[in-house]
């Protein structure tokens, strides 16, 4: 839910001749960012949010990403900075969205064997991020849950005509 190293990363990548991609793993409240419920209905241990990846496509996207992260801290903070679908509908221009890791709403539905819910959620995000800006994300981290999820994610992407992207659950130390 933060972009603390974004400017330094951008500068160093440019200096090295690498095209940087600025993004953030955001936390999405299951309902409104103003709802301070302590847990998701589907997983009381999850801390009240789902993960989602947002990547800036251009300067407008970077500015919207900054606005989303700021709103997460100022308006949606409940243990972590959280945003919601209303903010995503308002501030999605210039952003790509990836469906997220195992803690995403799509993957959590798959883990509960609720494929209809996974399809519904993916469809909602595909509408918000129209024009092929929503990607189904698969990862190869050798976890059994991920292997199961990947199988369903590939099928889901094909069924809904959504593009896919292979990633890894990366985080930084410094």
What are these regions, as identified by a protein language model?
Residues 1-174:
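Phosphodiester-processing cores and adjacent nucleic acid-binding clamps
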């Amino acid at each position: 839910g933060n972009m603390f190293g974004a400017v330094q990363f951008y500068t160093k990548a440019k200096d090295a001749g690498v095209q940087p991609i600025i993004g953030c793993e955001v936390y999405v409240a299951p309902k409104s960012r103003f709802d301070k419920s302590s847990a998701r209905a589907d997983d009381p241990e999850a801390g009240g949010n789902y993960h989602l990846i947002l990547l800036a496509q251009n300067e407008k996207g970077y500015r919207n990403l900054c606005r989303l992260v700021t709103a997460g801290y100022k308006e949606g903070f409940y243990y972590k900075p959280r945003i919601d679908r209303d903010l995503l509908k308002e501030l999605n221009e210039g952003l790509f969205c990836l469906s997220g890791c195992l803690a995403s709403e799509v993957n959590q539905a798959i883990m509960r064997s609720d494929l209809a819910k996974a399809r519904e959620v993916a469809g909602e995000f595909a509408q918000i991020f129209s024009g092929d800006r929503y990607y189904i994300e698969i990862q190869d981290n050798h976890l059994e849950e991920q292997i199961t999820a990947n199988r369903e994610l590939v099928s889901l992407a094909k069924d809904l005509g959504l593009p896919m992207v292979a990633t890894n659950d990366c985080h930084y130390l410094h």
